[in-house]
Amino acid sequence: MGKNAEPVCVTQLQAEKQWQYEGVTVLQASLWLPDTKTPGSAGRRFRRYYRLYARSFFRYCQMELFPQALQIYRRCREQQQPFSPLQAQLRTTVTLQNERLLSLYTDLEENTDGRPFCIRRSDGWDLTRGYPLTLFQL
């Protein structure tokens, strides 16, 4: 990519999904991830990475959390206890952004069966080329 390439302009992708059983919402998932509409290969790489991240998150919710939510819902119904839908969120926070660099972290938060759980991971990006950076390169 040439030196005059347009750097990636970062926006936000927001999406929500709900899973239901017998008309009752048992799982709610939402995400806020970086996105871009910047044309060119750098923008495409960046967009593709986080769109795949979003699909993977919702697939994880479908395959892992939805069965757990069903089990908890059925147990609550059998024991005549109140039920609250399970929650999962994927949220990104930008910590540094300039024309060349982007540093951010993403929290995956789950609340399953009343026990909160959080995993944090960080990413760094060269916005002019659209490639991830190692911590050393930041």
Give short role names for the model-derived ranges.
Residues M1-L138:
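Compositionally biased intrinsically disordered regions enriched in Thr/Gly
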